[in-house]
Design a protein with these regions (language model features):
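Structural signature of outer-membrane beta-barrel domains
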Residues: 42, 98, 110, 156, ...
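Short acidic/polar hinge/loop motifs at secondary-structure boundaries
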Residues: 108-135
Length: 272
């Protein structure tokens, strides 16, 4: 009786062992491709704010580029452009502009666009790589001017690799014969990043499909279907340097923005 009990136990043990061996032989190994997780301090800080924040990078800016930064951003919901001629434009966020919003370029607030309706942004539209727009009260972060929001132009970030890069861009418009272009050259080596850009635009008087217009209840003739004194040109030069190593960071930007353009007669006062 005891012998049968022992033999039955041994038989069950060998059966279980053989079944486990068959199951282990049928398991297949699968190699998964690597998963790369990237992040930055800038994006982490953006998630902490309760304001409506939108970030627009180079691909969006190129797709909607018009030669004027504010006109490029006017497709953003809540952002509007107050255009004065072909070159000057002032931004508005949710109906407010002038000294009710702040415009920052590389950490420096633009002051010129606040004074009057005929003062636009002194910024080269070709020289913008990334724009961050905050909609809502931001006075604690950017000063008392940022009651309605902020348009912040962010500096170019290094790729942390030794490289030589460049860019050439052309712009043309038929409505006023605009011809423009920009050339950029840059080098990144070790902890240094240096970039130089030159941009220039020329444009003539606006073409309109009418021979007369009504301005302040007066009938004004349009000779040759062109709005006289709306031509102009602009020439911009900028140099940017960036140094980053461990806990040290330095950014230097020098720019010269020159704009000369006319205003349509009657833009200020009664037409002659």
């Amino acid at each position: 009786m005891r012998i049968r009990y022992v033999s039955g136990t041994l038989g069950m043990f060998f059966t279980l062992f053989s079944n486990a061996q068959v199951v282990s032989d049928t398991i297949k190994s699968v190699d998964l491709s690597e998963v790369v997780v990237t992040g930055s301090y800038r994006h982490a800080q953006e998630k902490k704010t309760t304001l409506t924040l939108e970030l627009f990078q180079k691909d969006y800016l190129n797709r909607h580029f018009t030669g004027n930064l504010v006109q490029t951003l006017k497709n953003v919901p809540g952002v509007h452009s107050m255009d004065i001629g072909a070159g000057f434009s002032k931004p508005m966020i949710r109906g407010l502009g002038f000294n009710r919003i702040a415009v920052s370029e590389n950490g420096i607030k633009q002051e010129g666009q606040q004074w009057g309706a005929d003062h636009g942004l002194e910024i080269d539209a070709f020289n913008v790589d990334e724009v961050r727009i905050l909609k809502g009260p931001s006075s604690l972060l950017y000063g008392s001017d940022a009651m309605r929001g902020v348009i912040e132009i962010l500096p170019l970030l290094p790729q942390k690799e030794n490289r030589f890069f460049g860019e050439a861009a052309l712009l043309g418009k038929s409505v006023n014969g605009t011809v423009g272009g920009s050339l950029m050259l840059g080098i990144e080596k070790n902890a240094w990043l240096v970039r130089v850009r030159f941009s220039e635009q020329h444009y003539g008087d606006y073409h309109v499909p009418v021979d007369t217009i009504v301005y302040l209840t007066q009938l004004v003739p349009v000779y040759g279907r062109k709005l006289k004194n709306t031509a102009g040109f602009e020439r911009n030069v900028s140099v940017m340097g960036d140094y980053r190593k461990r806990f040290y960071q330095m950014n230097i930007a020098v720019s010269n923005v020159y704009q000369k353009m006319g205003f349509f007669p009657g833009a200020h006062g009664i037409h002659d």
